Each structure stands twice: as C-alpha cells, then as structure tokens.
A protein has these predicted regions:
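A short acidic, Gly/Pro-enriched loop at the edge of an enzyme's catalytic core
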Residues: 1-5
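Repeat-blade elements of multi-bladed beta-propeller folds
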Residues: 113-136, 158-183, 199-237
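Blade/loop signatures of beta-propeller domains
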Residues: 74-106
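Short loop/turn segments that connect beta-strands within beta-propeller blades
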Residues: 141-143, 186-190
Length: 238
C-alpha cells in the first residue's frame, strides 16, 4: 500500500517500476487507492511496465496487482529435486557468486542432529519447507518470514541413504507421510486440508508429485527409519 497516495492523493515516484522491483515474486500483492484519476493511476503502471494490473473506479481509484513466479525460476520439490531424481532444479536465473539473502529463524534449536541424514528442505512456488525435530516450518523463500509452523511428534524420518523422504511439495501443498496416511498441508497457511490412506496393513513410503498426480509406494507398518530418541540413532550393527 502507499500512504502518500491514500492520504495525499499523489503517486509515489514517476512510475511503478520500483514497486514492481520490490514486490515479492510468486504471490506478492500490492493494493493502491486514493484521490487520483484512474487514467493517471493506469499510466503510472504503464510507464513502469507492470503487467496484469486490475483497476476499479469509485469514490476513489483503486488498483491491485499480483506478481507471479519469476520466469525461469526453478523449484526443489523432492529429496533429489524432482520426481525424476535428477538433482537439478532447472533454474535459469542463478548465475555467478552466491550470497546470503536473509538470516534468522528458525535457527538450529528445533533442528535434528545432522548425523541422522535427515530429509532435505524443499522449495516450491516461492516457499521453503523445512523439517525440524518432529516439527515442520513453511517459510517465505524471498525474505525468510515463517508463514507457519506445525508440531508433529508422530512424524520423523532419517537415514535417507537407506530410505525415502517423508515429504514432497507442489505449488499449493506440502505432502507428509504419517504412517498409513499422507497429509496434504496448505503451503501458505499450514492447515491440514487433505488426507490419503494407504491400503490396510501398509504405510506410506516413497512419494512423488508429477503434474497433478500424487504417487506413492507402501511398506510394512513401522518399517521406516525414524531415529528413535529413546534408544539412540543407530541403524545397523555394521
């Protein structure tokens, strides 16, 4: 929103290019309104080369613009990037040296020990999904804001060299395997919205999202590696 436009009725800057530059990709929304002619508001966006602007006229002029995914941006939706396990995000934007985009929560405290070889974080549609020690975080990939956190004492996975991850992501959902069930978590809110059952006497195992399909295999109950906290994190005697 623009305080100057709302209170004074003057547009901020010569055009909307700066607004578009700082607006978060993959879901950022800007809403502007005030005592300004609609044609002036429209031309302000046109000069800034901002696409997809919706205008409404009433006692005040209003404009709303939503920014989509960056063209060429890649995702990391599975343990090894995609359902084909290529370890390639297919991102066409990252070049040269890398730096720190943001720094902060959730930090190391809620994370499990790295020695357990735990599931990798996932990235989809501008969000990051991180698995802590029996808890999960949904985060804004562009500024690090924690969108939601979810305590799940019953969900744990480790020893990934010998097992599959217990989570995959799509543009809209994070899918978690929880014993016999696969839970679909709303990527933006953290709400548990979907539940899929494995056949009786089986647990969910490997999962993948391909297009609009959720695929999975099943295993015997309680056969996944969970790194039990009470008996230690040993997997074999070798």
């Amino acid at each position: 929103t623009s305080e100057r436009l709302l209170i004074e009725g003057t547009l901020p800057g010569a055009d909307a290019s700066e607004l578009w530059r700082v607006l978060r990709p993959a879901g950022g929304v800007a809403v502007l309104g005030g005592e300004v002619k609609q044609v002036e508001l429209k031309n302000w966006f046109v000069r800034g080369k901002v696409p997809g602007v919706k205008l409404e006229d009433g006692k005040k002029s209003w404009a709303i613009v939503r920014r989509g995914k960056l063209k060429g941006a890649g995702d990391w939706t599975h343990q090894y990037a995609g359902p084909d396990n290529t370890t390639n995000s297919r991102d066409d934007l990252v070049r040269g040296d890398m730096g720190i985009l943001w720094w902060g929560e959730p930090g190391p405290k809620p994370m499990p020990d790295r020695g357990g070889r735990n599931p990798a974080p996932l990235a989809a549609n501008g969000r990051l999904f991180m698995q802590g020690n029996r808890m999960f975080f949904g985060m804004d990939a562009y500024n690090g804001t924690i969108l939601w956190s979810l305590s799940a004492p019953e969900i744990r996975r480790s020893n990934l060299p010998r097992d599959g991850s217990n989570m995959v992501a799509s543009d809209d959902y994070l899918y978690l395997s929880d014993g016999r069930y696969c839970i679909g978590i709303d990527g933006q809110t953290g709400e548990r919205k979907l539940r899929f059952s494995a056949p009786k006497g089986r647990d969910w195992s490997f999962m993948a999202v391909a297009g609009k399909q959720l695929l999975g295999s099943s295993v015997l109950p309680d056969s996944a590696y969970k790194a039990d906290d009470e008996i230690g994190e040993w997997y074999d005697s070798g």
